[in-house]
Amino acid sequence: MNRCLVVIPTFNEADNVPQLLPIILNLGDHFNVLVVDDGSPDGTAKLVKEMQKTEPRIHLIERAGKMGLGTAYVAGFKFALANGFEFIFEMDADFSHDPQELPRLLDKAQTYDLVIGSRYISGVNVVNWPLRRLMLSYGANVYTRIITGMPVRDATGGFKCFRRKVLESIDLDAIHSNGYAFQIEMNFKSWRNGFKLHEIPIVFTDRRNGVSKMSKQIVYEAVWMVWRLKIK
């Protein structure tokens, strides 16, 4: 089995990381984890370093401050490409994404180039979100699909698997978006470059521990990103 890297951006995830990483690694020896930590004051990076002492498949990038989701994933993608990983995953640290679903993403990635764990491909599969946030997310995805023409029902989700060749085709240094906009941009560029995208249904459960990182700025950025992609 070709090596897999699960990239997990973190900011104050000390409650979740010690539980999450062992679950991922127990899925098989081909799974590695890269934590990209943005200077978490709660000691997230310190916990990861302790785990690294006994597990060589855990990797860590420490950054000086809160630099954003998009740049964290770009750093992770560059690490994956530089270290020979074939399948590169995005995943939240807070158990919103079920780590047991990673093998399903990997299985579909044998056939497709980008596999998206989709909240909306088979109805609406979201747990613990207030109605306003759910409508905002669902509406943003309908809006994205209409404006860009991209045939993806969950363009803003962050649980996915890229084949190496997809990331190699994208100028990662030109990616400057964050949050929803980052997910939309990566999906769009993968699709525009001719790669095969596929969605599988997942259940998204709002974070187990900690505080949500959602903000109005993330939403506004996504609204403008859709038009930027449309006119390029």
What is each residue range found by the language model?
Residues 13-16, 40, 98:
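Donor nucleotide-sugar binding loop of glycosyltransferases
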Residues 8, 30-40, 61-62, 91:
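Short beta-strand/loop segment that forms part of the nucleotide-sugar
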Residues 3-5, 32, 185:
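Cell-envelope/extracellular polymer assembly enzymes that use nucleotide-activated donors
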Residues 90, 116-118, 200-202:
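Short glycine/serine/threonine-enriched helix-capping/active-site loop
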Residues 13-26:
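Short, well-formed alpha-helical segments that are part of the catalytic scaffolds
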